[in-house]
């Protein structure tokens, strides 16, 4: 099958970015290429055209490949709801919530849909570039594996192992991986690469040769650190943790324990008129914030309790009294109302939780999950916007008479009588340039001519150039069989 797989020596070694760059490089060679990740764990999901969901990293990789995101690109998606359990999405559809022990028992049965999705992609494209998850060196997870070597062997896909020199110990990472995995798994590895190098690459020549000598694997190159990665949609909430910008308007967002779809913040952190700050657990909401954003969450009632435990409810009321603005998105919108009821226990124990009371609305959870892309207009400015909805629950109440937007001919969201508190189910809306500019002007912020989508395209091209300059891309792609 025409495929090659990038696995890593650990999490956050840059696998997702490498696959995105390789997809763009292959596309520029005239190949029909598609990304594929057998199993992902993320609360940052993208909605596909057919109403399914996949990891947002695979959506970015699809964009790099010039494709619409498809559920086959990420057939198994785990969305953590607690420390013990995750919602399981198979081929875009929710199949239930499993505790960790139950997941390990069920995992082997999911190889069939994984191979089914992979087969459809390989039949439709010249090349499929596969991304592993975590590391194959986690040999305690090898039994029933569908994400790394279990998949590679089942699908007969050659593997290139990526190590991360930025965190140190890359020689031990790569040589150690070979030492702990089964010989049959090691035989699937065709080579390695070193990612995130800082400084003069020539200084690592000896270490590079040592890895080749110790493993017998071919090296495909050393990739210098790519700072423009910060301009691409964040895959992990920690990527947004560093304050960005030096603008006059401070935008503070609350780092919930189950934060989801935080890519809403990506366009904002690139606006020069803003300073975007993550409020971490235990920290107060900064008094200088002009806007506080309550982002999405995988557990609205759970994170509402988490919010109160940090004292953020008191901070939000003080912020509102000072004349500050508040925006709730999806789960954050639900929190702003009077109550959040979950009679069927879809996100935890059945029951109801008192909301923050900043909007006169109530939310009731129900099992029908809304997954859809939308286009509409922002009511206050009249500017067009687009985005997506991905939520359970319906929200209603008097403040819905002041909708945030109109989408597909219906009102969406809610606003307080004073206009300073708004809520919406729409993710991704800040990628709409005209709307974003109008919204920020309403806050008194200096706006820019940022064309967000065009910038993402430019960075993907630069990423492909970067890999072409430092990797044997032709040799790596030639591994596909």
UniProtKB/Swiss-Prot annotation:
GO process terms (BP): cobalamin biosynthetic process
Superkingdom as given in the UniProt entry: Bacteria
Residues covered by the GATase cobBQ-type domain: 248-435
- What are the protein's UniProt keywords? Cobalamin biosynthesis, Glutamine amidotransferase
State which pathway it belongs to: Cofactor biosynthesis; adenosylcobalamin biosynthesis
Q: Where is the active site?
A: 330 (nucleophile), 427
What would be one Pfam family of this protein?
Answer: CbiA
The answer to whether UniProt assigns keyword Lyase to this entry is no
The record ties this protein, via PROSITE patterns, to:
GATASE_COBBQ (PS51274)
InterPro entries the record matches: Class_I_gatase-like, CobQ/CobB/MinD/ParA_Nub-bd_dom, CobQ_GATase1, CobQ_N, CobQ_synth, GATase_3, P-loop_NTPase
Function according to Swiss-Prot or TrEMBL: Catalyzes amidations at positions B, D, E, and G on adenosylcobyrinic A,C-diamide. NH(2) groups are provided by glutamine, and one molecule of ATP is hydrogenolyzed for each amidation.
**Protein's name in the database:** Cobyric acid synthase
Q: What is the source species?
A: Cereibacter sphaeroides (strain ATCC 17025 / ATH 2.4.3) (Rhodobacter sphaeroides)
